[in-house]
Amino acid sequence: MLRLLIGLLLMSFISLQSASWQEPLRVSIEFVDLPKKIIRFPAHDLKVGEFGFVVTKLSDYEIVNSEVVIIAVENGVATAKFKAFESMKQSHLPTPRMVAKKGDLVYFRQFNNQAFLIAPNDELYEQIRATNTDINFISSDLLVTFLNGFDPKIANLRKACNVYSVGVIYIVTTNTLNILSCESFEILEKRELDTSGVTKTSTPFFSRVEGIDAGTLGKLFSGSQSKNYFAYYDALVKKEKRKEVRIEKKEERIDARENKREIKQEAIKEPKKANQGTENAPTLEEKNYQKAERKFDAKEERRRSRDERKKTKATKKAMEFEEREKEHDERDEKETEERRKALEMDKGNEKVNAKENEREINQESANEPSSENNATLKDTENTSVLKESAAKKEAPKPSSKEEKRRLKEEKKKAKAEQRAREFEQRAREHQERDEKELEERRKALEMNKK
C-alpha cells in the first residue's frame, strides 16, 4: 500500500512538471526548402518527434495542406519534415494542391489531450489513469476491438489513433512509462514506473473485452507474440528508439549540407543591375519557391492541355454522331419514298387488272347469241338450249379465274401493307436509337465542357 501511494505521488509530480507539451501550440513558418521538404520555425518547448499540420489561410477560409514531424531542435529553432496531409485521407474530397510556404501556421498538440493506454494489468492501468487526470484516456476496450485479436503494430496503432482522434499513446514497459506521438511514434517522454510487482499480464494488454480470436490464419501471421507482454513492448519501443537515433544522425547530415549551402549562397550573392536599385538577389528560399511554382505551373499546363484534348475529342465524336444521324435520316427517307412508290405501283396494277377483267366479261357476253332473234325456229331453239347449257357449264370458269386473281391481288396488297408497317416500325426504332445516342453524346460533351 505504501509503495502504491509513493508511486501515485511520484507520477503526479512528474505529470505536473511535463504538462506543457500537452497544451496546443501554433507557430509561424520562417523558412521553407521545397526540394528537401524541410521547414524551420521557433522551437518554443517542442520536442523531436512531435506531429503537427500546416494551415494556409485564404480569403475567407483555411486549408490544411501538409503534415509535419519535428526532426531536430537546435538553438531555439525547430526543423521539421513535411509531406502531404494524409491523416484524414478521403478519396471523395478534393485534394489541396498547395504546399507549405513562409508565413503559414503550424498547429501542434491539437489532440494531445486524448490518449490510448497500454498496460499489463488493471492495477497499473487504473494507477496511471488516476495520476493523469488532465488526459482523456480512450477506453482500451475500443483499441483491443479495433486490433481484432492481432498483436499491436505501429501501422495499426496509427490507424486507431486517426479513427478515434487520439494524439499520444502511453505504453508501459519494464520499469518505464513511455509516452509516444501517435503519428510519428516517436518517444516524447519517459517516466519511471515500478513494474516489479506485476506477476500476471493480459494479452495483448489490459482490457475488459475477452474472447476475440483472430482465427487460425491470424494466429499464424500475427504469431501471438504479445503473450509475453514486457518482452514484446520493450522490443517495440526499442525499435522506435533505434529509428530515432538513425533520424538524428540523418538530420545532422542534412543540417551540415544546409549550412554549406547557405554559406555558398551568401558568398555568390551579387547586387542587381543599377536600374533595379540596391535590392539584393532573390534568397534561396525565394528561388526554391519560384522553382516549385514553375513546376506547379507546368503541371497545370499539362493538365489543361489534356483537358483541351479530351474536349476536342468529345466535340469531334459529337460531330461524327450528328453526321451519322443525318445519314440515317436520309437513308430512312429514301427507303420510305421507295416503299411508297412500290405501294402506288401495286395499286395501279390492281386497277389495270380490274379493267381487263371487266373488258373480258363484256366481250364474252357480246359473243353469246340472242335467244329472242331465233325464237321461231325449233332447231334454232334446240341449238340455243344446247348453247345455254354449254354456257352454264363454262360460266363458272371465268368466275373461278376472277376469284383467284382477286385473292392473289389481296395477298399482294396485304403483303405490301405488312412490309410498309415493318419498314415504318424499323424507321421509328432507328430514329429512337439515334435520338438516344445523340442525347448521351450531348450530355458527355456538356460534362467535358464543365
UniProtKB/Swiss-Prot annotation:
Residues 363-386 have a biased composition (Polar residues). It holds the Pfam family PGBA_C. InterPro entries: PGBA_C, PgbA_N. Its main location: other. GO terms for cellular component: cell surface. It comes from the Bacteria. Residues 262-450 are annotated as: Disordered. Residues 262-273, 284-310, 317-362, 389-450 have a biased composition (Basic and acidic residues). It is found in: Cell surface. Binds plasminogen, specifically, and in a concentration and lysine-dependent manner. Plasminogen is the precursor of plasmin, a serine protease that cleaves fibrin, fibronectin, laminin and vitronectin. Acquisition of plasminogen/plasmin could enable H.pylori to degrade host components. Plasminogen bound to PgbA is capable of being converted to functionally active plasmin. This is Plasminogen-binding protein PgbA. It comes from Helicobacter pylori (strain J99 / ATCC 700824).
